[in-house]
Amino acid sequence: VIQGFGNVGSNLAEHLYNRDNAKIIAVGESNGYLYNKNGINIDNLKKFYKKNKNINNKNLGKFYNKPEKLLELECDILIPAALENAITLKNVKKIKTKMIIEAANGPVSFEADEELNRRGIIVLPDIYVNAGGVVVSYFEWVKNISHIRFGRVEKRFQEHKILDLINLIDQKTKVKTNPELISKIIHGANEEDLAYSGSEDSMRNAFNEILQVKKKIKKSFR
């Protein structure tokens, strides 16, 4: 369930839907939320939103005009990506999820966080969740000061190594590898691939460090 379909919410929904095959059952905006228990087609919703500037698409799900009820839907992961203090002591007891990912700034109040922690609901804090953008900005800064794009130095070297290996396999098996398949195999990572890989590695390492501290002090992730 995702609250907010702006720049953060829509792109997050797109990545979860296409890269991770996540089932997104509800998406909310300020005037209500779209719900489909079988999952919303996010690609179609993004096209609709771009054209109509709203998410009220009856072909993709049922629209409810009570935006505050979105947060009370039962789900595995709840992602507030719009409002500060979306979850407070006023509605925290109605939250029915296993994990909350704070994609907005401060969507869960301190008091609500303590209650959620007591109930065993994991809350990934905004200061961690939103760090990915800073990490990628750092990569861009490093690239700019070095005046060389990522992957340029080793790209051809890696391609030749893989091509030599394919040729060796062809010789031993006496079977010629399809040229189209060879092209796919030797295709090196582009800058976007490297940015994803680098940011994922940084976020994984950061999470493991946070997790170790959490276990040591026996508190919430916040």
What spans do the regions from the language model cover?
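Structural motif
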Residues: 22-26, 76-77, 98-100, 121-122
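Short, flexible loop segments at the rims of nucleotide/cofactor-binding pockets, characterized by
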Residues: 55-59, 77-80, 100-102
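Generic beta-strand/beta-sheet core signal
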Residues: 3, 11, 28-30, 80-82, ...
